[in-house]
Amino acid sequence: MANKGPSYGMSREVQSKIEKKYDEELEERLVEWIVMQCGPDVGRPDRGRLGFQVWLKNGVILSKLVNSLYPEGSKPVKVPENPPSMVFKQMEQVAQFLKAAEDYGVTKTDMFQTVDLFEGKDMAAVQRTVMALGSLAVTKNDGHYRGDPNWFMKKAQEHKREFTDSQLQEGKHVIGLQMGSNRGASQAGMTGYGRPRQIIS
């Protein structure tokens, strides 16, 4: 962000709207989960958007996070012993995390762009990606998730049903509720259309 000048006019307005989407309460929950999932050696960030960005910026913590969701021996991201100090190495580490998260099942619409994190352009998108990763981990329930399962929403899972041919045939003869009831109402006492009403005293 050192090379980027201040925003004015419409750009400033757009950036302001993006920054308002950042959720400080969600940040606390995500930090708790990351620390619980990766271990206390990852440390804790300073509070706020900037602290969260600096904490995750080099991609090492994110890589450890996605690796912790896999069994030993099949970790998708190689984590360097010393955090990378060169800018392109840090961006490459973040890109490896994004690829591993996508392979884990996070949809492209839930993914942030590398610059969103690296330049702090859209930290709410970073939160969305980590949130989606947590939701998937809770949904998979494969024993690798650590933390409170109530921190994330469980995604809906497919529930296939198999019907026999006889069940399908029976279903064709049932009057659906959208059609109304076939009981109670009858045409008893009604006269045909066009006939005058007969009043006999």
UniProtKB/Swiss-Prot annotation:
Residues 154-161 are annotated as: Could be involved in actin-binding. The gene is Tagln. It is found in: Cytoplasm. Actin cross-linking/gelling protein. The modification Omega-N-methylarginine is found at R183. SMART domains: CH (SM00033). Residues 24-137 form the Calponin-homology (CH) domain. Calponin-like repeats lie at residues 175-200. GO terms for molecular function: actin filament binding; protein-macromolecule adaptor activity. Pfam families: Calponin (PF00402), CH (PF00307). The modification Phosphoserine is found at S166, S181. This is Transgelin. Smooth muscle and mesenchymal cells but not in skeletal muscle or lymphocytes. The modification N6-acetyllysine is found at K172. GO terms for biological process: cellular response to platelet-derived growth factor stimulus; epithelial cell differentiation. The modification N-acetylalanine is found at A2. Keywords: Acetylation, Cytoplasm, Methylation, Muscle protein, Phosphoprotein. Belongs to the calponin family. The keyword Disulfide bond does not apply. It comes from Rattus norvegicus. GO terms for cellular component: cytoplasm.
